[in-house]
Amino acid sequence: MNPETKARIDQLVTANKVMVFMKGTKLMPQCGFSNNVVQILNMLGIPFETLDVLADAEIRQGIKEYSNWPTIPQVYVNGEFVGGSDIMIELYQNGELQEMLEVALAS
């Protein structure tokens, strides 16, 4: 990944308490996994920002290197990589996600 792409990702991850790199947008997710993440965050009423990786090939590849995680979507909370769709579902079901997000939004 080039330094410019890394700097863009750094800026997005640090500027937004909850940042989702996904396929599509909040209003029109382009894959089921991205849709799962959007639905969970919407259900919890959590404000979040997204970046459509389908519209940006450098970010689409760069985010995988950045997190050392091979799949999209990718969720960051307070600058920390949380995971993708499966991890978000698991954290939501066991109540950890709500707690993590409440702490993040309070900081």
Curated annotation (Swiss-Prot):
SUPFAM superfamilies (UniProt xref): Thioredoxin-like (SSF52833)
Residue positions binding glutathione: 23, 60, 85-86
UniProt keyword terms in alphabetical order: 2Fe-2S, Iron, Iron-sulfur, Metal-binding, Redox-active center
Annotated Glutaredoxin domain residues: 6-107
InterPro entries, per the entry: Glutaredoxin (IPR002109), GRX_PICOT-like (IPR033658), Monothiol_GRX (IPR014434), Monothiol_GRX-rel (IPR004480), Thioredoxin-like_sf (IPR036249)
Keyword Mitochondrion attached: no
Annotated [2Fe-2S] cluster binding sites: 31
Gene3D superfamilies: Glutaredoxin
GO molecular function terms listed in the Swiss-Prot or TrEMBL record: 2 iron, 2 sulfur cluster binding; disulfide oxidoreductase activity; metal ion binding
UniProt similarity note: Belongs to the glutaredoxin family. Monothiol subfamily.
Protein name: Uncharacterized monothiol glutaredoxin ycf64-like
